[in-house]
């Protein structure tokens, strides 16, 4: 008995059911699908076979009456999306902020949390208002507990009235005092008008205390002013003979100044050079000392003494202006003798400024060797061991201190006190022990 043929149903893409008989009972699924694809002219590699929804291997035997469906293969991607999901899952596990996530209804957790917080705040609004009102009441109670100022007290009213009365009294007294001062000032002005000449003379005397050089052009004007005041001067000299001594001496010296200058030119030259070497303070002392002596010795009134001082100063200025032409005529052309006399006179005056033992202790300035350059510049060295303090060195003057500092090679600038202190600080020290900061910097030659 011949074996019955096996019949298989194939369902392909785009085609209906189709029955395919097999040549033998042991034919495989590959043979059936291959024959069907050849008939339909479609590639076999693009399909896979399913039977009852289950993949069938190509080597399996065909079952009779079974339905085999051809499923087309889908073109898949490169892959890698799974790795991205794994990385995102790791980040989600690490973070603690879930507000960007969504719940099962699709709402973000951020919005849900905000709604919950708003509901809680609305519930607590009444409590906050109650607490605010409680704090306001407590603040009012604290203020009411403090003692209140009573402005209706009788003591306060009485003090206010007394203060107002005192203010009115003080204003009235001030107005009365001001009016009385104005009246008294007018009366004193009318009484003192005739004596304005004396006050003007006193002011002029104060202004003429300065010593001015080069006043030869005012000789005629000064002579006329002194001639007009001779009558008043004679009366004053007769009343106070002690005060007329300096003026008389000045007049006699002024009248005989030309003869003395002609007879002894050397004395005039030495005196002229001595006056030039004096400091401004020494020049002002002769002008102020006679006035002081007059006030101490005489018991006259201040107004009379001021007029006498003024007249005496006029006579002194006249005699000085008369002596200046004689000095110019008798000046010698030799500068060396004049410089020596000036130095001797300056030393004598410095010695006279000291008192007692200090005069003996100050030695005369001794110049260094003639071969040194400092001697050519007039630099002198002092015996610092003869001075006991810096104040004694200040009496030598700025120029002497400068010369002494230059002789030692020290800085020679600064005020009188600074120079004296700098010079006194190196007393008894050798050149190696002196502070290097005190030495003057060497002068740099000009670059060619």
UniProtKB/Swiss-Prot annotation:
Upon binding to PCNA, the N-terminal UBL (ubiquitin-like) propeptide is cleaved at Gly-77 by an unidentified deubiquitinating enzyme; the resulting mature SDE2 is degraded by the DCX(DTL) complex in a cell cycle- and DNA damage dependent manner. Both SDE2-UBL and the mature SDE2 are polyubiquitinated. One of its GO terms (biological process) is DNA replication. Its main location: nucleus. Residues 393-427 form the SAP domain. Residues 109-149 form a coiled coil. The record marks 77-78 as: Cleavage. Residues 1-77 form a propeptide. Keywords: Cell cycle, Cell division, Coiled coil, Cytoplasm, DNA replication, DNA-binding, Mitosis, mRNA processing, mRNA splicing, Nucleus, Phosphoprotein, Ribosome biogenesis, RNA-binding, Ubl conjugation. Residues 178-208, 221-372 are annotated as: Disordered. One of its GO terms (cellular component) is cytoplasm. GO terms for molecular function: damaged DNA binding; snoRNA binding. Residues 306-315, 324-361 have a biased composition (Basic and acidic residues). Pfam families: SDE2, SDE2_2C, Sde2_N_Ubi_vert. The modification Phosphoserine is found at residues 267, 279, 332. Interacts (via PIP-box) with PCNA; the interaction is direct and prevents ultraviolet light induced monoubiquitination of PCNA. Interacts with FBL/fibrillarin. Interacts with CACTIN. Interacts with SF3B1. Interacts with U2AF1. The PIP-box (PCNA interacting peptide) motif mediates both the interaction with PCNA and cleavage of the SDE2 precursor by a deubiquitinating enzyme. The SAP domain is necessary for specific binding to DNA. Inhibits translesion DNA synthesis by preventing monoubiquitination of PCNA, this is necessary to counteract damage due to ultraviolet light-induced replication stress. SDE2 is cleaved following PCNA binding, and its complete degradation is necessary to allow S-phase progression following DNA damage. Plays a role in pre-mRNA splicing by facilitating excision of relatively short introns featuring weak 3'-splice sites (ss) and high GC content. May recruit CACTIN to the spliceosome. Belongs to the SDE2 family. This is UBL fusion protein SDE2.
């Amino acid at each position: 008995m011949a074996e019955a043929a096996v019949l298989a149903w194939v369902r392909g893409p785009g085609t209906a059911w189709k029955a395919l008989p097999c040549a033998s009972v042991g034919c495989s699924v590959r043979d059936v699908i291959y024959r069907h694809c050849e008939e339909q002219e479609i590639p076999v590699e693009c399909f896979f076979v399913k039977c009852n929804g289950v993949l069938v291997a190509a080597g399996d035997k065909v079952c009779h009456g079974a339905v085999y469906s051809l499923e087309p293969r889908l073109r898949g991607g490169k892959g890698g999306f799974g790795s991205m999901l794994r990385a995102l899952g790791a980040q989600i596990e690490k973070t603690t902020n879930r507000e960007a996530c969504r719940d099962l209804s699709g709402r973000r957790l951020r919005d849900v949390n905000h709604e919950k917080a708003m509901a809680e705040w609305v519930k607590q609004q009444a409590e906050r208002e109650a607490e605010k009102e409680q704090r306001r009441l407590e603040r009012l109670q604290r203020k009411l507990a403090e003692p209140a100022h009573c402005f209706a007290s009788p003591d306060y009213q009485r003090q206010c009235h007394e203060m107002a009365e005192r203010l009115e009294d003080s204003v009235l007294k001030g107005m009365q005092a001001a009016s009385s001062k104005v009246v008294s000032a007018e009366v004193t002005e009318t009484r003192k008008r005739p004596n304005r000449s004396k006050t003007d003379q006193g002011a002029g005397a104060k202004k003429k205390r300065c010593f001015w050089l080069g006043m030869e052009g005012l000789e005629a004007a000064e002579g006329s002013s002194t001639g007009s005041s001779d009558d008043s001067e004679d009366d004053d000299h007769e009343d106070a003979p002690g005060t007329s001594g300096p003026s008389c001496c000045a007049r006699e010296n002024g009248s005989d100044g030309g003869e003395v200058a002609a007879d002894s030119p050397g004395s005039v030259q030495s005196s002229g050079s001595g006056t030039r070497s004096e400091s401004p303070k020494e020049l002002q002392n002769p002008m102020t000392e006679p006035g002081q002596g007059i006030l101490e010795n005489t018991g006259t009134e201040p107004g009379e003494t001021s007029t006498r001082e003024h007249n005496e100063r006029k006579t002194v200025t006249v005699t000085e202006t008369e002596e200046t032409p004689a000095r110019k005529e008798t000046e010698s052309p030799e500068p060396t003798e004049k410089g020596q006399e000036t130095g001797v006179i300056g030393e004598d005056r410095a010695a006279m400024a000291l008192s007692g033992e200090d005069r003996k202790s100050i030695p005369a300035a001794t110049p260094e060797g003639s071969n040194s350059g400092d001697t050519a510049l007039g630099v002198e060295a002092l015996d610092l061991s003869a001075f006991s303090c810096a104040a004694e060195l200040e009496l030598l003057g700025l120029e002497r201190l400068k010369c002494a500092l230059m002789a030692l090679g020290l800085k020679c600038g600064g005020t009188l006190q600074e120079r004296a202190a700098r010079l006194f600080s190196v007393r008894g020290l050798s050149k190696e022990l002196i502070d290097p900061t005190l030495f003057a910097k060497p002068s740099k030659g000009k670059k060619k």
